[in-house]
Amino acid sequence: VTATSQHHATSSPAEHLDSTTVVSWKAPISFAVVTALLAVLFLTTRHSGDAVFRLSAPRDLIQIPEIVLNGPVTTWTCVVVMTAITVAAAALVRAKRRVPLWVVVIFAVIGLVAFLTWAAAGARTPVIPLPGLLAGALSLSVPLIFGALCGVISERVGVINIAIEGQLLAGAFTSAVVASVIGQQWLGPIVGLFAAAISGVLVAFVLAAFSIKYFVDQVIVGVVLNVLVIGLTSFLFSQVLAPNAALLNSPPRLQRIPIPLLSEIPLIGPMFFRQTLIVYAMYVIIALVYIGLFHTRWGLRLRSVGEHPTAADTVGINVARTRFWNVSLAGAIAGFGGAFFTLGAVGAFNKEMTAGAGFIALAAVIFGQWDPIRATLAALLFGFASNLQNTLSVIGSPVPSEFMLMLPYIVTILAVAGFVGKVRGPAAAGKPYIKA
């Protein structure tokens, strides 16, 4: 539902929209729907207990007192505040003004507090351990972030990478086998990480060869590669890894490395500074991709090829070579991230253990509007939804288990369809370039 301004703005462009700008009612309508759903939930399933939010882990140097919230009072207070925000958002749209992003963030946080309070107040153990919830969310986000960075680079250079799922799975499989064969506590996982990156490059190499050199539809190639990697790894797992699990599928896991002092900061410390080597590498890769894309000659060439390959070719940029090598680089990043499944989380390879993470990463790329920082934040949102499912199950929340299993995917759908709006990707993404 949209409304178009019929008069020119009298204030600054940041506050009001001109006559050609379309104002969207999507935010107020979304706010109203979420508020109504929470109100119905709180009315039909009343929980009269208290909810306890634990802000410090037992090992933290600084202990912060727990926050105890009364269930009914907190939930209905949040509903009232959310209703007020909804009315304010509607007023902004009626006045031909955009709803700021910070308003959306505040609304989401208040809604989350209301839901967590309601869920904990009716649980067997009404304690929400926020340090564990946040640290676990980051851990579950790691492969999503690597996959999202892979997707950003690929699509920015003009190649739609549906094969992120296959690259993650190939990385998980290869890292498990290589680390198991080497066996040493530190050397095995480190070599396994490099092997995972190489396997991601191999999958990306096939994608690049067929889509760039032979002009095969990029989406079709990506889907075929996903099916191929799933089938190949499943076959090798059944025929090779399972009968020889002690030798080929028992990789040593990466150990957590706490950063002195920083790891003791309440909430933030356990989440960011008490992690494994692959997570610290992720921080560096995020920064490098962002700086490289927007502040280096390499990034300028990459983006020009993805936006206007003909113009890039005119000024002397080899379009095919630029696409080929950057798709391969993206595959290395995804393969490296896939190693987290075996070396950082589970500790052994299982069939189809990525469980659609590549497709959620692709959604994070769209949600993040092809920006590495925004895509990372989107992946963190999806990881938080996944870990919230685990946390509520542990505390014995009355939320049905079927809904909890659906929660990460519901958040993905709502984020991409409900809050992104109309976004435009790289102009030449998915279009083969044929040199005249």
For each feature predicted by the language model, list its residue ranges.
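Interfacial/capping segments of alpha-helical transmembrane domains
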Residues: 42-62, 99-102, 124-137, 242-251
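Short, non-helical or kinked segments that cap or interrupt transmembrane helices
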Residues: 153-174, 190, 212-225, 301, ...
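Pore- or pathway-lining transmembrane helices of multi-pass membrane proteins that form conduits
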Residues: 213-238, 248, 352-366, 378-418
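Transmembrane helix-bundle core of multi-pass membrane transporters
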Residues: 58-67, 230-294, 349, 397-404, ...
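Cytosolic-side transmembrane-helix boundaries in multi-pass membrane proteins
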Residues: 1-59, 76-117, 288-289, 307, ...
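Inter-helical junctions in multi-pass inner-membrane proteins, predominant
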Residues: 46-50, 126-129, 134, 293, ...
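Helix-loop-helix "hairpin" substructures at the membrane interface of multi-pass membrane proteins
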Residues: 272-349, 372-373, 377
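Single transmembrane alpha-helix segments in multi-pass membrane proteins
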Residues: 85-86, 132-182, 193, 202-219, ...
